[in-house]
Amino acid sequence: MTNTVMISYANTSFAVPKDSFVNVVDYTLDTLDEAKSIEIMTYKMPNVWGKDADATALVLFPKSEKPKDGWRVVVWTHGTVGVSDSCAPSLSLLNQGFKVAAKSLLDAGYVVIAPDYEGLGVAGIHPYLNLESEAKAVIYGVKTLQNQYAGDFNGAWMVAGQSQGGQAALGTAEYANEDSTFKGAVAGAPASSLDKIIQEVAPVALSRLEDQEKRANTNLEDRNSIHSYATLLSYGAFIGMGIRAEHPDFDYLD
């Protein structure tokens, strides 16, 4: 019989099996002076189809002594990095923003977990901005680590993130709201109402910026309006990929 930890919100429930741990390997692409170790943990989580899928997360332990009542965990949920496997934070150099946050957390004695999210760094398509998928990547990552090293952790954990990670933090707070060991979420600039931003807000703002740059005779290669428009198109493509991950019949032309 498999023991599980139940996490639920509203009518949605899912379980984190005790055997969700797959393996752990050293992370060797970058270093952080404040970290005693940086590893890549592979674990099982349900994908958007409800099937078991591998997921990965960076796990950073501090150099300080383990508290008498066990380690506490802070999960860092990253912002938009792209949708291809090679974009996964665990396959890249450490982001500078993440380094700043991780240094402070490690100095304070926290274990830091940074999930890649479903479909990043592993097989499958990344369901960009899928709230439930992001929340599961976080919760399964935390519970897997705590289950694997059961005697070393206090149980208490929280989540913090920015941009896409801000949305992931809010989603985690929804799905973990009945978990008494979950202590809170910090969401910086969470992704929200992107359809309205892309279709209504951004075109007006970019048009005004373009007019200003034209009047100033700004060279094409130096125009922020052009670079911003290209970025906007990229986000649109990411969103399309995210929808396609869950709905393969989605037509990009729609």
Model-derived segments and spans:
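Short, surface-exposed "cap/lid" segments of acyl-processing enzymes
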Residues: V48-T56, L60-G109
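Alpha/beta-hydrolase active-site loop
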Residues: Y128-G151
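Catalytic-loop region of hydrolases
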Residues: M1-K66
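Primarily recognizes the serine-hydrolase "nucleophile elbow" in alpha/beta-hydrolase
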Residues: K143-E213
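Short beta-to-alpha linker loops that shape the active-site pocket of alpha/beta-hydrolase fold enzymes
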Residues: T80, V111, D116-L120
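Loop/turn elements at helix/coil->beta-strand transitions in domains of secreted/extracellular proteins
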Residues: G70-V73, D107-I113, N154-A156, S180-G184
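Glycine-rich "HGGG/HGxG" loop immediately N-terminal to the catalytic nucleophile
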Residues: G119-L129
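Accessory cap/linker subdomain of secreted extracellular hydrolases
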Residues: A191-D254
